[in-house]
Amino acid sequence: MKVTFEQLKAAFNRVLISRGVDSETADACAEMFARTTESGVYSHGVNRFPRFIQQLENGDIIPDAQPKRITSLGAIEQWDAQRSIGNLTAKKMMDRAIELAADHGIGLVALRNANHWMRGGSYGWQAAEKGYIGICWTNSIAVMPPWGAKECRIGTNPLIVAIPSTPITMVDMSMSMFSYGMLEVNRLAGRQLPVDGGFDDEGNLTKEPGVIEKNRRILPMGYWKGSGMSIVLDMIATLLSDGASVAEVTQDNSDEYGVSQIFIAIEVDKLIDGPTRDAKLQRIMDYVTTAERADENQAIRLPGHEFTTLLAENRRNGITVDDSVWAKIQAL
């Protein structure tokens, strides 16, 4: 089905206010959920909202909490999210990293005791729109087996890198072949995954999203490489924030909350002039996209460039929402 941005935001806002969230906070949170969905990231927008409300009702998320600065070391700061609303706090933390970068050339904010930030790409994009390189990542509850194991002991720990090119170039990727959100999107659409995304119950690689959702044997991105990246990203976020690791979040908490996150902004213009920056970026993009195609009907893609098209289509034609997901939200 199709809904407008206004309908989507109003639905989110209604549910948030009915759960006791104050009107200003509810409006800002609903806006971010709606913007994420409008951008085409359904898995971490509308599809994720019922799960967000469940955690709000369970007390994992404290809606009136505010992040608190703990330590300041010039370009590096350490903050405690105090289990505040994840997407609103993440936006504030990237804004703070940008402020630090404006003074120092680079800014790094390490955040502990945080909640799920929903679409991580929003915060990299936020920096790139202002002319900064944006880098951020988060750890999570253990939802992926390390390479060679059957039992979940590492997080998908998504990493975002956004570049202020025209259009913005951005990688937003979990350390698994697919996020659990994308498994859900494909299952709801009745589609197999385009490539193997995990193992079935017999240990064979599979493209069936429902099987992987159930047995949790999701495949690390690049096999052992994604497994290794997940571990070191967790270590860095834990040390810099003095926060909880994947092991602590999984073993000590009743659900996925109290995670650790990193936000980095780099002011490119302190290192290179604008025309030179633009020319270098354009040469990179042209060199990549003019490669001989494996399939003449399939253009070479640059990461993140599709979001401009998806956003325009959703604004023109309405936002696609799965019927069953919309019914869940209406029933909240």
Curated annotation (Swiss-Prot):
Keyword list (alphabetical) reads: Cytoplasm, NAD, Oxidoreductase
Q: Where is the protein found, in the record's own terms?
A: Cytoplasm
Molecular-function GO terms, alphabetical: 3-dehydro-L-gulonate 2-dehydrogenase activity; NAD+ binding
- Annotated signal sequence is none
Q: Does the keyword NAD apply?
A: yes
Q: Where mainly located?
A: cytoplasm
Q: Which Pfam families has this protein been placed in?
A: Ldh_2 (PF02615)
Q: Which reaction does it catalyse?
A: 3-dehydro-L-gulonate + NAD(+) = 2,3-dioxo-L-gulonate + NADH + H(+); 3-dehydro-L-gulonate + NADP(+) = 2,3-dioxo-L-gulonate + NADPH + H(+)
Q: What SUPFAM superfamilies does the database record attribute to this sequence?
A: L-sulfolactate dehydrogenase-like
Superkingdom of the source? Bacteria
Q: Which residues bind NAD(+)?
A: I168, T169, M170, V171, D172, M173, S174, W224, K225, G304, H305, E306
User: Which Gene3D superfamilies does the record cross-reference, listed alphabetically?
Assistant: 1.10.1530.10, Hypothetical oxidoreductase yiak, domain 2, Hypothetical oxidoreductase yiak, domain 3
Subunit record text: Homodimer.
Name it.
2,3-diketo-L-gulonate reductase
**What is the source species?**
Escherichia coli (strain SMS-3-5 / SECEC)
